[in-house]
Amino acid sequence: NLYNMGLLEPAGEILHDLGFSLESLCALEPDAGLGNGGLGRLASCYMDAATGLNYPVTGFSIRYEFGIFRQKIVDGWQMEFPDNWLEMGDVWLHTRKDDAVEVRFGGQVHEWMDGDKFKTAQTGYQSVIAVPHELYISGYGSKAVNKLTLWSASMPQSFDMNAFSRGDYVRALEQNTMAEAISKVLYPADDHINGKRLRLRQQYLLVSSSLQ
């Protein structure tokens, strides 16, 4: 953003006067393992190019808590560790809890005619709340500022007090844990049925919340 708005040099001079360097501050920000694949790079190029050309666009994705795993060699073996890109905070993201939407999973859809009106109702579903986090993108040489909306998932009620009071501590947090798993990890393993279901839930949450 500093580069796009022509503020890179002034920012560097101000930081120098304060005893810091822009390079050292930039080095502190972790390189998140998000969107590093071909499609991710292509999507970011679309956003950058459209904003630079003054087109009003909005991008959508999921606010993953962990990116692609980090790799380390330990005693000659490859080890995988979570990429906790949010451990230093998310100062670039603006959380909009008031704009959260409900996404319904599962259940049954009932259809009936009420006179000449066709009506539907969904029952037995699991409700998940999608909260938007907005990242603003400035255009190079343009006056446009567009946004990338990232969705995080949680339950409407994150704590089951009745289950906790019965001593069922795991169940008291189970539903919220299952909901938060949707936005937990980028590219979860899908070589088993639970992984396939999780990826489908991720895709459904992204489409439903973005359309809403």
Give residue spans per PLM region.
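A conserved ligand/cofactor-binding region detector
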Residues: 1-212
